[in-house]
Amino acid sequence: MSKADLIVGLQWGDEGKGKIVDHMAQTHDYVCRFAGGHNAGHTIVIGDKTYALHLIPSGVLNPKAKNVVGNGVVLSPKDFIKEMEQFDNLEGRLFLSDKAHILLPYHADIDQARERMKGDKAIGTTGKGIGPAYGDKVARVGHRLGELLHPEKLASKIIAFFEMNKPVFDAMGVEMPETVALLEELEGYRKVLAPYICDTTQLMWKIIDEDKRILLEGAQGTMLDIDHGTYPYVTSSTTVSAGACSGLGLNPKDIGKVTGIAKAYCTRVGNGPFPSEDMGKEGDRLRENGHEFGTTTGRPRRCGWFDAVAMRHAVRVNGVDQVALMKLDVLDGFDEIKVCVAYEFEGKEIDYVPYDLEDVKPIYKSFPGWEKTEGAREFDALPETAKSYILALEEMIGTKMGIISTSPEREDTIIR
């Protein structure tokens, strides 16, 4: 029996998981997505082509790899089908869980209405409907992909759902969809997606028993986890390593090596606490150097320095075996590089993540910068100050930086 390798984000998402999944997918038979929706995105550069993936696992770019979308995902059929159109020959290479929940256009309408109602207290969601779709799942009124294979049953459920929820739609000022039109839309989705829908839990057990090499990929990052993140400024799913089990039907003994992904600095999209955010010129420089604009929304990302306190928290929560440090080259040319090494909280210095990050202040340690790391493919090729920075981060978080990325290109990756 094999064990599945796991990739998980350690910050607030957008860490660069796509490049590492693409890199590791070259040696794996299956790549499996366990949570999230199309609010998150991977950007992968191969040669002169750039791929933006939101729902399809990154293994799709390896013609030998097969791809699984697990039951922990909420899937927008419209957006998924659009994403499928980028690729040929997906049949036999793509498997969608019949237990994954369907995200429909009215979920996005509700999401956006809620954000408007909150005013300056808005969370800053992508407005894609992820929260309402997960809300329906937890409230036991959601619709699952397997129901697309049984149109009559799905139709009766949708009619009953709208009858029950009409007062909710009216109260929020959201126009309720026309039932017949929605059912016709779903029938179109069924024709495209039906060949890919199956019991992926049974598939996962089978490929583990067959000793296949399996890679599990999450979405977003630990600090956006519904339980362990900066609640309520979080996503609605489990983004940490434990979510791979519930989101794919695995047990903890099925999990092998855990690789955590982190940038050499920090970014965040949307509202919520961000202790090491730099609101000045250096934050702007990080954003420009790193092209920090959302894959899904195009929104500029908030930028700041590496937060070693939050990183230690994430490493422990996820049981990380090694860290992949991304975008080291974005720090090229800085005279000084800061790292948040502790927080000031209620008049005291602390080295852990408290209940609420809103009121903490960062305590920084400065490191000398370097001229160039871009394109380096060997650790010894890095400037001495860059190597010292990496070794210092390792000591702070208690885990080895086993992979270091020095550009968006697939080949510009250091393996230690």
UniProtKB/Swiss-Prot annotation:
<keyword id="KW-0436">Ligase</keyword>
<feature type="binding site" description="in other chain">
    <location>
        <position position="235"/>
    </location>
    <ligand>
        <name>IMP</name>
    </ligand>
</feature>
<dbReference type="GO" id="GO:0004019">
    <property type="term" value="F:adenylosuccinate synthase activity"/>
</dbReference>
<dbReference type="InterPro" id="IPR027417">
    <property type="entry name" value="P-loop_NTPase"/>
</dbReference>
<feature type="binding site" description="in other chain">
    <location>
        <begin position="39"/>
        <end position="42"/>
    </location>
    <ligand>
        <name>IMP</name>
    </ligand>
</feature>
<feature type="binding site">
    <location>
        <begin position="41"/>
        <end position="43"/>
    </location>
    <ligand>
        <name>GTP</name>
    </ligand>
</feature>
<dbReference type="GO" id="GO:0005525">
    <property type="term" value="F:GTP binding"/>
</dbReference>
<dbReference type="InterPro" id="IPR042110">
    <property type="entry name" value="Adenylosuccinate_synth_dom2"/>
</dbReference>
<keyword id="KW-0547">Nucleotide-binding</keyword>
<comment type="similarity">
    <text>Belongs to the adenylosuccinate synthetase family.</text>
</comment>
<comment type="function">
    <text>Plays an important role in the de novo pathway of purine nucleotide biosynthesis. Catalyzes the first committed step in the biosynthesis of AMP from IMP.</text>
</comment>
<feature type="binding site">
    <location>
        <position position="14"/>
    </location>
    <ligand>
        <name>Mg(2+)</name>
    </ligand>
</feature>
<feature type="binding site">
    <location>
        <begin position="13"/>
        <end position="19"/>
    </location>
    <ligand>
        <name>GTP</name>
    </ligand>
</feature>
<keyword id="KW-0460">Magnesium</keyword>
<feature type="binding site" description="in other chain">
    <location>
        <position position="126"/>
    </location>
    <ligand>
        <name>IMP</name>
    </ligand>
</feature>
<dbReference type="InterPro" id="IPR042109">
    <property type="entry name" value="Adenylosuccinate_synth_dom1"/>
</dbReference>
<dbReference type="GO" id="GO:0044208">
    <property type="term" value="P:'de novo' AMP biosynthetic process"/>
</dbReference>
<dbReference type="GO" id="GO:0000287">
    <property type="term" value="F:magnesium ion binding"/>
</dbReference>
<feature type="binding site" description="in other chain">
    <location>
        <position position="220"/>
    </location>
    <ligand>
        <name>IMP</name>
    </ligand>
</feature>
<keyword id="KW-0479">Metal-binding</keyword>
<keyword id="KW-0342">GTP-binding</keyword>
<keyword id="KW-0658">Purine biosynthesis</keyword>
<feature type="binding site" description="in other chain">
    <location>
        <begin position="14"/>
        <end position="17"/>
    </location>
    <ligand>
        <name>IMP</name>
    </ligand>
</feature>
<feature type="binding site">
    <location>
        <position position="301"/>
    </location>
    <ligand>
        <name>GTP</name>
    </ligand>
</feature>
<feature type="active site" description="Proton acceptor">
    <location>
        <position position="14"/>
    </location>
</feature>
<dbReference type="GO" id="GO:0005737">
    <property type="term" value="C:cytoplasm"/>
</dbReference>
<dbReference type="GO" id="GO:0046040">
    <property type="term" value="P:IMP metabolic process"/>
</dbReference>
<dbReference type="Pfam" id="PF00709">
    <property type="entry name" value="Adenylsucc_synt"/>
</dbReference>
<feature type="binding site">
    <location>
        <position position="41"/>
    </location>
    <ligand>
        <name>Mg(2+)</name>
    </ligand>
</feature>
<comment type="subunit">
    <text>Homodimer.</text>
</comment>
<dbReference type="InterPro" id="IPR042111">
    <property type="entry name" value="Adenylosuccinate_synth_dom3"/>
</dbReference>
<comment type="pathway">
    <text>Purine metabolism; AMP biosynthesis via de novo pathway; AMP from IMP: step 1/2.</text>
</comment>
<dbReference type="InterPro" id="IPR033128">
    <property type="entry name" value="Adenylosuccin_syn_Lys_AS"/>
</dbReference>
<protein>
    <recommendedName>
        <fullName>Adenylosuccinate synthetase</fullName>
        <ecNumber>6.3.4.4</ecNumber>
    </recommendedName>
</protein>
<feature type="binding site">
    <location>
        <begin position="405"/>
        <end position="407"/>
    </location>
    <ligand>
        <name>GTP</name>
    </ligand>
</feature>
<feature type="binding site">
    <location>
        <position position="140"/>
    </location>
    <ligand>
        <name>IMP</name>
    </ligand>
</feature>
<dbReference type="InterPro" id="IPR001114">
    <property type="entry name" value="Adenylosuccinate_synthetase"/>
</dbReference>
<feature type="binding site">
    <location>
        <begin position="327"/>
        <end position="329"/>
    </location>
    <ligand>
        <name>GTP</name>
    </ligand>
</feature>
<dbReference type="InterPro" id="IPR018220">
    <property type="entry name" value="Adenylosuccin_syn_GTP-bd"/>
</dbReference>
<keyword id="KW-0963">Cytoplasm</keyword>
<feature type="binding site">
    <location>
        <begin position="295"/>
        <end position="301"/>
    </location>
    <ligand>
        <name>substrate</name>
    </ligand>
</feature>
<feature type="binding site" description="in other chain">
    <location>
        <position position="299"/>
    </location>
    <ligand>
        <name>IMP</name>
    </ligand>
</feature>
